[in-house]
Amino acid sequence: MSRIRLPLILSGALLAIQLVASAYQAPVKVNRGEYFPARDNWERRKPADVGMDAAKLHAAVEFMKSHETAAPARDFSDQEIIFGKLLGSIPAERGATNGLIIRQGYIVAEFGDTERPDPTYSVAKSMLSTVAGIALDRGLIPNLDDPIANVVEDGGYDSPHNRLVTWRHHLQQESEWEGEMWGKNANFLGKEAFGGAEMKPRPIQAPGSFYEYNDVRINRFALSLLRLFKKPIPDVFRDEVMNPIGASTTWKWVPNPVKASGEW
């Protein structure tokens, strides 16, 4: 297995989580009634009101504030070194360390600018798997073990090898799909294209037999879902998931303006 991209995370986040966990005390009975946070009105509580130790919670927050990650760089100057040739736009800089601690639906701690939108890379995989679930529920995907070539006819699954790729393979990152997306090959070879994430040559395995964390194949999966819905996947996610659950409206999926060989 190989991992080629890590999401934006706080350095030392695991230790911080341990600190927060240690701040938890015995449950305190609170007469909360029926409560579900509104989109822009999450209620706040003191740590003691939800069974947390205020001093330990404060220590956890201070730890996180003082352990900002060094990667990516604030100005994203290291992105091509890490990931290779960039596709699409990227902000001039990222925000500083920030976060929320929520218990029982209430905000008990907040630090930094939590309303600033910042790039979050691998969250796309969770988004796409959710959209795939909607497609399955609607019957757009009859069966997760069906070959994608049965319903997607854009040339991306025409080869004998790719015709074996199923929806489950993409969802489990075991597709071994062969091809290019926006000028980047799924084999992840080449320093210019992939930077420090480039891989060593290896034999391609049968779909479903080898796991690989591979962004090119995730992009192919996203395009295949678009073919089913016949509209941008971010629109599907907004209309079917984010708006119904009352999520914030500040998020966005930044489109890729690059036109290159391999764009089906």
Kindly give the residue locations of the regions a language model identified:
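Conserved catalytic neighborhood of penicillin-recognizing serine enzymes
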Residues: 155-184, 199-209, 216-219
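Flexible glycine/proline-enriched surface loops and loop-helix/loop-strand junctions
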Residues: 42-43, 201-207, 217-219, 255-263
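N-terminal leader/targeting segments and the immediately adjacent pre-domain N-terminus
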Residues: 5-8, 13-113, 138-142
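Solvent-exposed loop/turn segments at secondary-structure junctions
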Residues: 106-108, 114-115, 177-178, 218, ...
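Short, charged, amphipathic alpha-helices and their helix-cap/turn boundaries
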Residues: 99, 106-107, 149-150, 173, ...
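Catalytic tyrosine of NAD(P)H-dependent dehydrogenase/reductases that use a Tyr as the general acid/base
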Residues: 121, 211-213
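Active-site helix/loop module of the DD-peptidase/beta-lactamase fold
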Residues: 138-176, 229-264
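Active-site SXXK
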Residues: 53, 105, 119-144, 170, ...
